[in-house]
């Protein structure tokens, strides 16, 4: 009789589900009000003009327009703003 001994168990073999963070709309892209621009943990990017921030630090468009990324301020912070077509 062919026998194969049972394989041992392991305590490894699991990982957390990816959270799909990152920039969703890049510089120059057109957005509509309510579109998510960046999903992030903490404020890696800060909200500029016409951009709102959610309780999980998600940045979203408050008006229609084009996305603009800029670095400004004494601490070289990254800001995301929306340039409206007026």
UniProtKB/Swiss-Prot annotation:
One of its GO terms (molecular function) is structural constituent of ribosome. Residues 1-22 are annotated as: Disordered. SUPFAM superfamilies: Ribosomal L27 protein-like. Keywords: Ribonucleoprotein, Ribosomal protein. GO terms for cellular component: cytosolic large ribosomal subunit. It comes from the Bacteria. One of its GO terms (biological process) is translation. Belongs to the bacterial ribosomal protein bL27 family. NCBIfam families: L27. HAMAP family: Ribosomal_bL27. This is Large ribosomal subunit protein bL27. The lineage of its organism: Bacteria, Pseudomonadati, Pseudomonadota, Gammaproteobacteria, Vibrionales. The gene is rpmA.
């Amino acid at each position: 009789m062919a026998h194969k001994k049972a394989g041992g168990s392991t305590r490894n073999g699991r990982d957390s589900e990816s959270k799909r963070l990152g920039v969703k709309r890049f510089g120059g892209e057109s957005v509509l009000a309510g579109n998510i621009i960046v999903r992030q943990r903490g404020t890696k990017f800060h909200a500029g003009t016409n951009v709102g921030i959610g309780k999980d630090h998600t940045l979203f468009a408050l008006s229609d327009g084009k996305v603009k990324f800029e670095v400004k301020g004494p601490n070289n912070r990254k800001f995301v703003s929306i340039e409206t077509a007026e």
